[in-house]
């Protein structure tokens, strides 16, 4: 089975070889291409190329119809009609160039005849910088060199090493790019001073070249292996006692060390001789991570350094902190007796902390008493406490690690903005790039030389004034008037910036708002309430979230317009203040529904409007608008009512509007039994009116006339229209009218004189037949024309007082007619009921005397 398989394999290989030979032969079966002087030429040489057809391989056996074409790669460079073609070619480039000869017949495709490759190159240059090295005591010798320029031809390199006792080692390399060869032999330190010679030779078709011989000894070419097993040890956990350990080969005489902090690019170098694998380092920093590397060498002057060892990373021990904390503070009044102190400080640098800071110690002291009031331990970089507003206070802050504490930083608590003359002037904040703000100011008005330092403070602006917002600050020398702040600066965030000028125990400050980048706010304020206050409205709103403000706000705008109105809205622009969240508006009209909304503005533009709220002012209109016209109307009415003519017309109108129950007539005495029984007596007593008015004596204490009460239901008097006094033509009537005149003035103002005269005459006629005396006439009144009736003759039954003037004598009718003309015609316009009044209750018993009864033309009065 094995013999069969082996035979098949040999047969397969034979077939493949025959096919390749056949293909080679068939490639040029129609002709040949020859190149002279050679297929390999030197750069810049000329070659002759000949293409010839074999017998009977042309076109139809006619040579004139044979067209031979010569191609250089795919480009035609020459052609000829016949059996052969000769062409001379120059200027060939470095490398390989392919030429192909083809036959072209009429009405047929071109037929390939044969081809040839021409190799253009240069002779090898002399190899340079030949060097040999043996890595470690147990390594092998290897050499490197520089080839020079590329020959573009097949080149063979031969490396030869000769040693003592005619020892020779040789190694070849047939790679065109060969520049390294390893002999694979090891030189031993038995003869460290023995010389060895190395040489390399390059050979190709155009020539050869050899390097200069390189002579060296064992110590020259042996490179030690890098040190290994590196470690470090700190004695008593002290950075001042640090020892580095490593391991080396036995023949190493010299070492070099390099080390650096892990965050640094610069190395510290140390050379040590006969270190024997250890070295003490004295300049390391506490609590710092270092990177260590070591290299070795066999001889001080001969040989080469080993490669650097692998890095060792280690952290040094802690030490007591150095430096002092940078402390700043804020003060805020709580009430009349207390204040809040917030302390802030920056972390120490790594070189100052010299370890991990475990905590900070804060000591608050009242300077007057001199004793420590508060001591606190905190792990944060801020601390807040409440102290009295009285007294002088100082604070000290120090940092502590596992080895100790730093020196305390002491500051006196004072009012940083108390001295107005120390306040920096013309403070400005401008954007300086993406995350930087340039703050500039002018020295205070007070002597600038008094300023010891400036402090620039900044923090994110929060509407609520949150004291938990991180505080940032930097200190500047007194001759500086600008500062570039970049720590914790973000785009589209507004910062409250303060510049303090400090001088001893005094300070002055100025503030401004600034941002590194801004654009229009993303939203407007949200109106949460609208209230009415004394004819105006108070609008309250929620502040825009900080992340939507997109920079420092400059103004708020309040817009309003009438609901369902297409007119342009009115607006009110309010300068932005951090603590403001309400604003009054007093230009709205009452009982009109308005739509209100708000926007906010930055230096980049205006935000979209916030929510809309409707509101209608329901309060009273402006009272001055009603008081002023009312006063004017009252003055005009008083002026009108003060005229006599208008008063008379008004009284007539009031009499017409008087209720019906107020104008009920008094019972007429003419209808009484007494008047009907003695009509003759009444007629006999007729006297002229003029005589009655002239000769009427003044009564002196008349006896009361007893009259039975016949008014079972008397209407109460609610209104007393004015009646006039009696006319004063005679002295006898003046005394009788005195009491009645007083009563009339107490009821109302006197009516016009004409009405008084008419009324007086009417009353005289009504009572002309009655005598208010006793039964017998007195002798002192002999001239009295009245008829005297005895008391016994008076009727004992009920009677009525006369009120009908129609029964009077005829000679007095004209007087009655004239009185009727003066009285206004009765018009019943009253809206008051006349039948629902309660009876008038008299307190005079069963009898009503005339001294208790006073009768007027329009009312009955007791």
UniProtKB/Swiss-Prot annotation:
PROSITE patterns: FN3, HEMATOPO_REC_L_F2. The modification Phosphotyrosine is found at residue 800. The keyword ATP-binding does not apply. On IL12 binding, phosphorylated on C-terminal tyrosine residues by JAK2. Phosphorylation on Tyr-800 is required for STAT4 binding and activation, and for SOCS3 binding. Glycans are attached at residues 48, 129, 166, 195, 271, 347, 376, 480. Isoform 2 is expressed at similar levels in both naive and activated T-cells. The keyword Glycoprotein applies. Residues 728-744 have a biased composition (Basic and acidic residues). Its main location: membrane. GO terms for cellular component: external side of plasma membrane; plasma membrane; receptor complex. Residues 725-755 are annotated as: Disordered. It is a single-pass type I membrane protein. Residues 24-622 are extracellular. The chain crosses the membrane at residues 623-643. Residues 644-862 are cytoplasmic. A motif (WSXWS motif) lies at residues 305-309. Residues 1-23 form the signal peptide. Keywords: Disulfide bond, Glycoprotein, Membrane, Phosphoprotein, Receptor, Repeat, Signal, Transmembrane, Transmembrane helix. A motif (Box 1 motif) lies at residues 662-670. Gene3D superfamilies: Immunoglobulins. Heterodimer/heterooligomer; disulfide-linked. The functional high affinity IL12 receptor is composed of I12RB1 and IL12RB2. Il12RB2 binds JAK2 (via its N-terminal) through a membrane-proximal region of the cytoplasmic domain. Interaction, in vitro and in vivo, with SOCS3 (via its SH2 domain) inhibits the STAT4-mediated activation. Binds STAT4 through a membrane-distal C-terminal region. The WSXWS motif appears to be necessary for proper protein folding and thereby efficient intracellular transport and cell-surface receptor binding. This is Interleukin-12 receptor subunit beta-2.
